[in-house]
Amino acid sequence: PKLKTKPTRTYIHIPPAVNRFNFLLSTIDRYSGKGSTLVIVPDNRSVQRLVAQLPEAVVLDSALERSERYRNFLTCRYGRGLTVVGTRSAVFAPIADLESIIVLDEGSEQHYEVRSPGWNVRDVAILRAMKSDLNLTFVGYSPSSEVARLIESKWIDFSSIRSRVEVSAFPQSHGELIPSRLMGEI
């Protein structure tokens, strides 16, 4: 029998100066080769931006035509080693060899289903990861209060990446609020 390592549960804090999609690609690469990875993003525009950089990804999104959505559903069901990108309903996708779930901006209001019974991606992803021993990674600029509580209780590991922001200072020449040299830069 195959020995499985203990799944990881992580929140990765990215600074605002870092492009979240480029960072997400590096996170996806870290899990590739270890089974399928499900990436859940808040909206269709985020799906399109990510898929533009991951052409081999399978898309699960309500914006697709019915036939394409069903074809992608079957690919998820029977395919192996996939990267699946979708919006909130993708959290329920029956992916054959799912190993990891990555959720971008878990506190976004677009991850919440308002119709009854109300649910959100974060809670479903946590339950699914616990039930199936999956790696669970949340990526964002700031954790929600629910995830912050899980970080505080040590159920989710917190990691932060370093970033450098280049700052230029322009002295005032005539006592103005915004230096005239800066206005020329804009």
Regions found by a protein language model. Name each.
Residues 79-83, 88-137:
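SF2 helicase catalytic motif II
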Residues 58-66, 108-118, 171-176:
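Flexible beta-alpha connector loops of hexameric P-loop NTPases
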Residues 49-97:
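Conserved motor-coupling elements within RecA-like helicase/translocase cores
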Residues 17-18, 43-47, 64-66, 90-92, ...:
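Conserved nucleotide-binding/hydrolysis micro-motifs of P-loop NTPases
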Residues 5-14, 33-37, 81-82:
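Pre-Walker A (Motif I) flank of P-loop NTPase domains
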Residues 1-26, 135-186:
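Conserved interdomain linker/interface between the two RecA-like ATPase lobes of SF2 helicase motors
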Residues 35-43, 60:
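Conserved RecA-like ASCE P-loop NTPase motor core of nucleic-acid helicases/translocases
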